[in-house]
């Protein structure tokens, strides 16, 4: 895991696989288990270090889903009280802001 170079919040990190492959659906069962285990370990450290009120976990698969790096990585983003006006919605609000994307 590494800290994101363009963090959304303090502690925003990336869980990155050793083996190179493009996206989550190419991961083996063992790799998915390793990602899950590391995510929990990092979360436990962040609970102590940053004391967040919650977390967002994100995986973008494909260019039109926002994937900009062609290597699987999972965003683990600590969330804090008051970090946004209204944290509800997440991707559920995506349909309200869809625009044509030609990347």
Segments from the language model and where they lie:
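HIT superfamily nucleotide-processing domains
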Residues: 1-103
